[in-house]
């Protein structure tokens, strides 16, 4: 890797529009416009596929309005979720099947790409030979509970998912962040795409593990200046989001959570209580 700024432009050969961006969206009327508009500002993105996952708000209506001015924007609709599938995985798999580009960029409806983000991702792929490039987004925090808990949670996750280890082909460590996960189409198809991780709640990490196990190079790094996300806009949403994911992220067993608590700063139990994280115990 070079020491260039994260926003530096990719070499001319990689600046052609070669990326299909895929955005699963369920009830994202407050965020979808900013996300789509940020994708539309990336010259390297040839098409934007928003997959409306049975929204009951104005998400689809907003996207249809944006289609009038963003000609490379398409709206897809999911049907019933097949048995054994997580809803989001079904949505992104539908988008991937419809996409035409040699690179697939999976991002979330609450993510906003910064200028030069797609070019930087392609540049990293070119320089490192990575078939999967992922950034851990810059987290936007506004409320007191976001400012208190989001940095804490991400500091703990950094302990488990070392960028250096993930990017080392000799290490079995693998991770990615689904808020910005770009993958070469051929590599994606060869490991079975999201169909191979259909039931995984942490589909981004599962996909990275499958890619690395198959011999593909990964690149994972910080996303400051690349992509920004405000994950939760209410305490209730944060409660539901992290209690679903945090248990799995730290190891998926009661013992792993206890070890995490032992090694963390003293107020981690408070954070777990605030998030409503329940550790299963044998009955």
Predicted segments with their positions:
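Long helical/loop segments within the catalytic core of UDP-sugar-dependent glycosyltransferases
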Residues: 74-95, 120, 124-182, 186-190, ...
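Catalytic donor/gating beta->alpha subdomain of glycosyltransferases that bind UDP-sugars
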Residues: 125, 131-158, 189, 194-256
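Alpha-helical bilayer-embedded segments of polytopic membrane proteins, i.e.
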Residues: 1, 249-283
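Cell-envelope/extracellular polymer assembly enzymes that use nucleotide-activated donors
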Residues: 17-20, 47
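Acidic helix N-cap motif at the loop->helix transition within catalytic regions
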Residues: 30-34, 57-66, 75-77, 116
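Acidic donor-binding/catalytic loop of UDP-sugar-dependent glycosyltransferases
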Residues: 58, 109-124
């Amino acid at each position: 890797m070079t020491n260039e700024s994260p926003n530096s432009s990719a070499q001319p050969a990689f600046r052609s529009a070669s990326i299909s961006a895929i955005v699963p969206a369920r009830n994202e009327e407050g965020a979808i416009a900013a996300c789509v508009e940020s994708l539309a500002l990336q010259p390297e993105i040839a098409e934007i596929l928003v997959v409306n996952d049975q929204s009951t708000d104005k998400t689809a209506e907003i996207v249809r309005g944006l289609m009038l001015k963003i000609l490379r924007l398409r709206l897809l609709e999911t049907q019933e979720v097949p048995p054994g599938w997580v809803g989001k995985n079904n949505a992104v798999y539908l988008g991937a099947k419809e996409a035409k580009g040699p690179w697939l960029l999976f991002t979330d409806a609450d993510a906003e790409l910064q200028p030069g983000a797609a070019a930087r991702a392609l540049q990293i792929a070119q320089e490192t030979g990575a078939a999967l490039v992922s950034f851990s987004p810059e987290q936007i925090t506004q409320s007191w509970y976001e400012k208190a808990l989001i940095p804490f949670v991400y500091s703990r996750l950094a302990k488990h998912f070392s960028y250096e280890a993930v990017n080392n082909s000799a290490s079995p460590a693998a991770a990615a962040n689904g808020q910005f996960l770009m993958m070469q189409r051929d590599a994606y198809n060869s490991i079975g795409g999201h169909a191979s991780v259909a039931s995984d709640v942490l589909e981004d990490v599962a996909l990275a593990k499958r890619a690395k196990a198959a011999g593909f190079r990964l690149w994972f790094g910080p996303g400051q200046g690349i992509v920004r996300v405000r994950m939760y806009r209410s305490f209730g949403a944060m409660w539901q989001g992290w209690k679903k994911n945090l248990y799995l992220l730290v190891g998926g067993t009661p013992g792993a959570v206890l070890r995490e608590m032992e090694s963390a700063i003293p107020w981690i139990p408070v954070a777990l209580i605030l998030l409503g994280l329940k550790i299963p115990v044998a009955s």
